[in-house]
């Protein structure tokens, strides 16, 4: 949370001008434009801007940082009124409804304590509809070992499947080399699961 007080969103290593892989995987999921979608750990990401442009109308965003969400709200202007905003710790989130698609780029890998990961998966299972889509991206094996001074956990498909358990079927995975605003390379891995 403090990270967003100290930096502009454009300076975060995970910042993307266009969330290409996320958008491609969301399109692959073929959810209806009025299906409920949540972007977990959205921070100051522009994914929600792109989803609005693609006519998705039932959007929710969640972040632990009120500052990050305020920045995104300001950027969106009047469009922000049509989005559900949640300032919450995802490991303790109580969703008011079930989602058809859950998107997380770069939150799960910050959960270094197995209890936090277990709680995240519990919230995920309770919040995602049967036949719902999970799109989750983390640092890949061989990627960064820390991010913004924080420890992370690297993943491959085997590790991610072990974390999520039997309720989720891996549909698709993609590797990305993300170029940070400081022009450094970071290895990410994206997964799309079906519940």
What annotation goes with each model-predicted range?
Residues 1-97, 111-127, 133-195:
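Class I (Rossmann-like) S-adenosyl-L-methionine-dependent methyltransferase catalytic domain
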Residues 100:
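Conserved acidic residues
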Residues 103:
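A conserved beta-strand element that flanks and buttresses the S-adenosyl-L-methionine
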Residues 106-110:
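Short catalytic micro-motifs in class I SAM-dependent methyltransferases
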